[in-house]
Amino acid sequence: MAYARVLLKLSGEALMGDQSYGIDPAIVQSIAEDVAKVVAKGTQLAIVVGGGNIFRGLKGSAAGMDRATADYVGMLATVMNAITLQDGLERAGVPTRVQTAIEMQEVAEPYIRRRAIRHLEKGRVVVFGGGCGNPFFTTDTTASLRAAEINADVVFKATKVDGVYDRDPKRFPDATRYDSLTFQQVLSGELAVMDSTAIALCKDNNIPIVVFDLFEPGNIGKAVAGEAIGSRISNAT
């Protein structure tokens, strides 16, 4: 395997499947089965999950909610997704722990960096919920932060598109996909991959990001093996 320790970022929207809201159990089980295959080969894997399938703080703020309050609601939505992922993973035979940045001891462990690393060393998947515990920060930024904290080799951003494009491929059929690019290219070009804080964190800590299509069967395993899928972002192309 090309990577020993991986941080997998899943958007909340990815868990919806073809639905317009909520969680598609079939998608959760498909992700769990792919993760199980990777973990069985010895890769240590942590997950950060978003909450946009249930609530998105920016939309709440745009509708008149206080931004910080809306972000806290979004953080709670990520915990719902994290617990759902834990259930799917454990049904797939993967021992899993949920750690949350907002303490809720009845359903999850509090986020403790050293404990998270110990879980990974024991072959458990750790799902991080609750964002980073502070408003005004995205779950993409949380993914970069947790990756740096647990000394991950790479961040996988598994999404609905098969990589990074020079413009929106849904609106522009002639959009060009990048096989590889630098963090500086992403920041300078304002490419819609992750927010600038998330990109800068990975840049400063020299953690590459691989963006790929979550819904292509086996892609998580291919990415862990270092196969050339999606787009790779790093300090040097």
UniProtKB/Swiss-Prot annotation:
Catalyzes the reversible phosphorylation of UMP to UDP. This is Uridylate kinase. Belongs to the UMP kinase family. One of its GO terms (molecular function) is UMP kinase activity. It comes from the Bacteria. SUPFAM superfamilies: Carbamate kinase-like. Pathway: Pyrimidine metabolism; CTP biosynthesis via de novo pathway; UDP from UMP (UMPK route): step 1/1. Its EC number is 2.7.4.22. GO terms for cellular component: cytoplasm. Inhibited by UTP.
